Amino acid sequence: MKTFNYYEYKSKRFDTSAEAEQVRNFIFAFKDGKQWATNYAADMVVNSFVDTYGDKASDFVLVCAPAANNKKYCKRFNRFAQMVSKGARVQNGNEHISIYGERTAKHFSTDRVCESFDYRVALDREYFSGKKVIIFDDVVTSGATAREFANELAECGAQVMGAMFLARTKRMYN
């Protein structure tokens, strides 16, 4: 699966520069659904779609990767997806995904093991069947979440074209 990211996300432990802090603040503001961050992210993604696909953007479906629960998903992605859909004329797949229950947020889990409390993601199989899908998420570290979600979409008959991320975690070791 092809992937694209706008920024590198560097942990404060490894990079205390003003630039790295600015990226971290942007990512956390986006995760919290802050309007300024949502607007900025949507503008970047709209420009990418328009520059890459032009009038053919309407052939694609943008769907955001599932969050820890439905409340976080809606807060983080609903307005963003609506803005991108309107600005780039891409189809909004978020309206065809439902999240039930809850799992531990992955960015809070040091060992990346998530506890699940009746967590389930339901996809509208009929809607996604035959669609060209691009997945969006805020941060990618290993890519496992995007790959798992891509597999679920493919099981519905979607053709996953790639994934876009605001940032990719940059691992920095001694």
Question: How should each PLM-predicted stretch be described?
Answer:
Residues 135-149:
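A phosphate-binding catalytic loop at a beta-strand-loop-alpha-helix junction
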Residues 66-76:
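Glycine-rich phosphate-binding loops at beta-strand->alpha-helix junctions
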Residues 19, 147-174:
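PRPP-dependent phosphoribosyltransferase catalytic core
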Residues 61, 134, 161-164:
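A structural signal for isolated positions on well-ordered beta-strands in alpha/beta enzyme cores
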Residues 76-82:
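Charged helix-capping and loop-helix junction motifs
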Residues 84-88, 153:
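Hydrophobic alpha-helical packing residues
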Residues 1-61, 98-129, 142, 168-171:
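Active-site-facing substrate-recognition patch
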